[in-house]
Amino acid sequence: DVSFSLSGGGTASYEK
């Protein structure tokens, strides 16, 4: 599965 997280600060985290 792929998960995409966007924090309020504007940083994006992409985990495979």
From Swiss-Prot:
Secreted in keyword set: no
Reactions this protein catalyses: Endohydrolysis of the N-glycosidic bond at one specific adenosine on the 28S rRNA
Domain of life: Eukaryota
Enzyme Commission number(s) of this protein: 3.2.2.22
Record keywords: Glycoprotein, Hydrolase, Plant defense, Protein synthesis inhibitor, Toxin
GO MF, one example: rRNA N-glycosylase activity
Post-translational modifications: Glycosylated.
GO biological process: defense response; negative regulation of translation
Coiled-coil regions listed in the entry: none
Family: Belongs to the ribosome-inactivating protein family. Type 1 RIP subfamily.
Designated name of the protein: Ribosome-inactivating protein trichokirin
